[in-house]
Amino acid sequence: MNQSPQRPKAVVLSRPVRLLWCVALYVLVCVLMAVFQRSLIYTPPVFSRQRVDMMAHTARLERWTNSSGQFIGMKRPSPRQPAEATVMITYGNGSSAIGCDHYANAIQGVADFDIFILEYPGYEDRPGPPSQSSLFSAADEAFLMLPAQKPVYLVGESLGTGVASYLAGTYSNRIAGVLLISPFNSLTDLARSRFPMLPISLLLEDRFPSETYLRNYHGKVGIALDGKDIVVPDKFGYRLLHGYAGPKKLWAFPDGRHCQITGQPAIFWKEVIAFWQTARQTDNVESSR
């Protein structure tokens, strides 16, 4: 009588071995996160110089260079000179200086302001790897090149709010007002919410602690938040708002998605500029759309 072949017995790992495998997998994930974290934080668009120049021409922007002739961003002087003030823009991840022409259009549509847009290292055709350190160094260089005799305002969006907050805290006496669009209180808190099982506070190198930098700034800070923002949930912006002790104003868009402010009408920018320029120190004024 033929006997049916016996099935191989399944290998059953002991509990200590299973635990060891879980620990090894967790450590591997942590190592990968530490090694590739900047690839997750920064997703720069990269273009040739020829394409950048072509897009800049279409957007009515011109190259902004430092004293050595190196590319540091884009600019658009006010069509009506002399300009009343200067606005420096720090954009969000995945965007670029050319991609901020809509801010120049909106702001110059209601005010005679010169617009300067910082380009981050590694973005468009600017050389260098992006990191918190390189972005801050680029911001320092660019800010110090702005005209000193006019009021300077900062507009930051998403990741760029970390750069704008750094500038506000570093050059507090030179900055007349700030607008932060879809901001976070710190990238550490935002990352921790995305990866709650990982020791983010130990792994993260680029922390962008906006709330810390703004402690050194006492000027006017406007904050625009979108209620349906899934990239930077508005709770992180509210943390930044409530933690700021200076004069502030909130624009809340309950149905808005990430950085949807770009579609706001001229009245929004008129309100922002009026808030910046008013002599009365308004504290914690809220406006909903």
Residue ranges: model-predicted function:
Residues 19-64:
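An N-terminal hydrophobic leader/cap segment in hydrolases
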Residues 70-145, 162:
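Membrane-embedded segments
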Residues 103, 210, 219, 233-242:
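Short alpha-helix in the alpha/beta-hydrolase fold that links the catalytic acid
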Residues 156-164:
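Gly/Ala-rich beta-loop-alpha elbow adjacent to hydrolase catalytic centers
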Residues 163-219, 260:
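Hydrolase active-site cap/lid region
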Residues 217, 222-229:
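Short beta-strand/loop motif that positions the catalytic acidic residue
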Residues 227-232, 258-259:
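Acidic catalytic loop of the alpha/beta-hydrolase fold
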Residues 256-267:
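Catalytic histidine-centered segment of alpha/beta-hydrolase-like enzymes
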